[in-house]
């Protein structure tokens, strides 16, 4: 059994960073993804560098806050104030052909470059709100990832036993984006404990293992603070994730060999 437990949103707020690092030190998290567009991102990167057993990837952000690039250079990605568009508006622009691929590529490269400038080598990529799976974005992400030497891109294909509109949409997006990511390794299946709340005890972990292949469990642990409330709609659920991921019984259920890094 090989399961990867990844905590998203490192750097989104000081409280989120604290929760992720605690989930690593006391729990089953061995992988996290850094969002570089928040005010607390640089400090989060510095703290993560002090954890030698924590793999830090890039959490591409195209829907929150300000771009790393000069807003004037990525006009198709931002609103009149120079901020990223929300998910709904970005989706409309993407599927109406109003987002320039060159601007997408420039912003993604800028985010990876900024992470490296903070001492983080992000060889595993995923994204905020799974936007990297949207076909127009996936094509650009796949091309830039190859140029950057990325060794892992998250797929979000839910196991068939998980059903619902969100799971079906992510399964379809993963299928459509497969060609864009061809040749870049990734997980076979993905479960988000924040939204799906699978049973995570010995029996639940055994059920996940039965799906076979390399699976990824995504989570969003964190402590609630004002920066988080201002930046994201996912707030109180993060405390629940923190409790789940640091439960000693869960660590026992996983076993030391079950929780592996994504990037060899």
Where are these regions (language model features)?
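Terminal accessory/targeting
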Residues: 1-4, 10, 14-124, 134-264
């Amino acid at each position: 059994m090989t399961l990867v437990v990844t905590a998203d949103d490192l750097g989104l707020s000081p409280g989120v960073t604290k929760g992720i690092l605690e989930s690593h030190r006391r729990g089953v998290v061995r992988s996290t993804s850094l969002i570089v567009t928040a005010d607390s991102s640089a400090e989060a990167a510095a703290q993560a560098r002090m954890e030698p057993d924590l793999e830090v990837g890039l959490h591409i952000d195209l829907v929150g806050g300000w771009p790393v690039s000069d807003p004037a250079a990525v006009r198709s990605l931002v609103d009149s104030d120079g901020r990223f568009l929300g998910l709904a508006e970005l989706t409309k622009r993407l599927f109406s052909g109003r987002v320039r691929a060159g601007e997408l590529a420039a912003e993604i490269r800028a985010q990876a470059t900024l992470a490296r400038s903070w001492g983080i080598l992000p060889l595993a990529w995923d994204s905020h709100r799974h936007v990297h799976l949207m076909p127009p974005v996936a094509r650009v992400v796949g091309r830039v990832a190859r140029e950057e030497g990325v060794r892992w891109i998250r797929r979000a294909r839910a196991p068939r036993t998980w059903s619902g509109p969100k799971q079906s949409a992510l399964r379809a997006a993963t299928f459509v984006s497969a060609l864009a990511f061809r040749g870049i390794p990734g997980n076979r299946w993905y479960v988000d404990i924040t939204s799906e709340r699978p049973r995570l005890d010995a029996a639940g972990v055994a059920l996940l293992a039965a799906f076979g292949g390399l699976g990824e469990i995504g989570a969003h642990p964190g402590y609630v603070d004002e920066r988080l409330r201002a930046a994201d709609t996912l707030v109180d659920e993060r405390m629940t994730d923190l409790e789940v991921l640091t439960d000693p019984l869960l660590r026992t259920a996983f076993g030391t060999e079950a929780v592996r890094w994504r990037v060899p």
